[in-house]
Amino acid sequence: MKNVKYGKCVRCGKTYDAVPDLTNCECGGILDIVYDYDYIKSVLTKEKLAKRENRSMWRYRELLPVEETTPDTPLRVGWSPLYEEPKLAQMLGIKKLWVKDDGQNPTASLKDRASAMAVAKAYEAGAKTIACSSTGNAASSLAGNAAAAGFKTYIFVPERAPKGKVAQLMIFGANVISVKGNYEETFKMSAEAIEKYGWYNRNAAINPYLSEGKKTVALEIAEQLNWEMPDYLAISVGDGCTIAGVWKGFKDLYAIGFIDKLPRLISAQSYGCYPINRAIQENKPWEPMEENTIADSISVGVPRNADKALAAIRESNGIAVCVTDEEILAAQRLLGRTCGVFGEPAGVTGAAALKKACEEGLIEKDATVVSVVTGNGLKDVANAIKSAGEPLHIEPDLDLMVKGFAERGVTVE
């Protein structure tokens, strides 16, 4: 790969050749992919990019760690819509707001970006089987992307994973193992199996290429905003891979001169599980936490990408905002009823944190903000019903309809 120099440990600084099956440093640290920005600047310009018809994450190949001969993955991942939301911006008391709906990806979450990268690197490695552990979205994204590309998958999920997400796995033909335990126990079992059977490792906390796939959401946002960067970007945080990838994407664009400023990150976590935000708020190393939140996709008590995530938040002079599950459900309703965007609880945690930050005066009135919705609401119908309530149940009688809605404070007209 002419555009990649090496993988570098974020903890000890040791470097490694960028082979397809690259994993953690021998010290246990996570690797970061280091690029040759001079080379990238010589082969990629804004004008060249603008002429490309490819509307997927692979339009940014010069900024991605793949060989020139590696084919694009079959499913169209990326280039999700970025909606300007003036009404919601006014409600929040800020200048401008955009909502990036990554629930529009093939398996309905941002994690398709990482799984597409995993499939590409598994192809380069000559692997036939890919495996991971997940609370749901990474699992379904791997299952779908791997199925389209002809790979076999083994996927480990904690038994609390929502049925809708597990159903996706089964439809995609994955070999699913539901583990009686929390995410950490599920992760350890997957790691043991991957080592024993030699499967390609899609675990984001181990495989440094996956955050490179996730960073494409930042590349898209910048291009969709015509390279005019927002002041803030709000996004939900679980193991830390996504927020680290977003920051890496913005820094890549800054390094090659495509943007002239970097946004501040708003790290959003639930009070039911917030090890990364607690480390920021208390200015100390992260510590494991119990997992107790409806936002299952970010319910990670042992965030193995914490080093990268914490560095990203601190480098950006970011804000760590925690919200309750009730505030998450309120944000789900707000986005749905104001923007027409249906996000799952973890997917709208960024929006919930943004709302809270605005209410607490942490965001300037003249600020411009992007809020990323990381997953579609249909992935967790049970909590959607809990959030929105039940429909009006009546006999087929219009008078009963009018009466029923009147009892709910709604006038039929």
Segments (PLM) and residue ranges:
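PLP-dependent amino-acid enzyme catalytic core
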Residues: 1-413
